Amino acid sequence: DKGIGDFLKRDSRFAIQGTFRDVQIAALGSNNRYNNFTIDGVAANDPLGLNANGFASVRNPISVETLAQIRVDFAPYSVTKGNFGGANINAVTKSGTNEFKGKVYGYETDQTNVGDVLGEPINQFSDETTGFVFGGPIIEDKLFFFVGYEESERFAPSNSQPIAAEDEAELRQIQDFLQSRFNYDSGWPIFNAPPESQEQTLIKLDYSINDNHRVEYIYQETQDINIREYDRPNLNYVFSSHYYVYPIDREKNTFAYVGDISDDLSLEMKYTDIVYKNDQDSLGGENFGHHRIALSSGEYAYPTSEQYRLSLIHISEPTRRPI
């Protein structure tokens, strides 16, 4: 149970497909992008709609070791919950208590721990995760802290089709020509891709002003580096230079107040500032164009940069939510 989907699949109203960055969560038969995912009531959805998981991160949007509970609503009667056609999924983070508690953890998996898919064996890979959580009092009964850090790394070969004997000589010709004429390193269709990685940081402070009022501060940052393919390497000869880096850096600061103004009136206020960055870049660099070359066999080769995916996206989104 190391992902959001691993918890939700226990509920028959959810259909979970895929793992890692490819996990898709469908609620009540709806599209997997129709969910609204929040962390402590603050939206953590994919702002661009490019991730199959619907999250604002490539892998888990938050470490499950930092969560106290996951709450799911399908048709809530509340003005504070909306923007979804599937399910509203809220992850609630842990808080510090009067007792110091901590945990150091690590786990790994590879292809030997995964079953075959339709009789076909899984390609070789390895996935490692390490992290820690720690919480306790700063001022007993008044001020508490909770921190968590997690890093993950995944190694996997490229998803390339085998190179046919009649095509290898032409592919070598293309590689040599680009190197000798333009001093351009195209790489090779079959290669060990750079590792995919993720780092997550959570810092939470809870201050109990008195029995009726409390304030809260949460800092969360998630950094993803993911290597993605284009032009279907399982059907074409896609050189390593044609893959591209898909990095995400999401930083969030949340300030919250919860209090009872009177016996009949309660107030909850939240202010959140979110900065989202996605600076995509081709492994082949930015100074060489996109080329498709037809081989004598009728197959296609893509030996240069993937220019269509180069972009810099920066989204700053302050939000206020009084209730």
Regions found by a protein language model. Give the residues of each.
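Periplasmic N-terminal accessory/gating domains of Gram-negative outer-membrane beta-barrel systems
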Residues: D1-S95, V114-G115, D127, G131, ...
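Membrane-embedded beta-strands of outer-membrane beta-barrel proteins
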Residues: I25, A87-I89, F132, I203, ...
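Outer-membrane beta-barrel channels and translocator barrels
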Residues: N32, L67, K94-G96, I139-D141, ...
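Flexible, solvent-exposed coil segments and beta strand-coil junctions
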Residues: L50, E65-Q69, D110-D116, F177-S186, ...
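Transmembrane beta-strands of outer-membrane beta-barrel pores
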Residues: P76-S78, G106-T112, E151-F155, E221-I225, ...
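Outer-membrane beta-barrel domain signature
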Residues: P76-T80, G119-P121, I190-A193, H242-Y244
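Transmembrane beta-barrel wall of Gram-negative outer-membrane proteins
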Residues: K101, N123-I225, Y246-L267
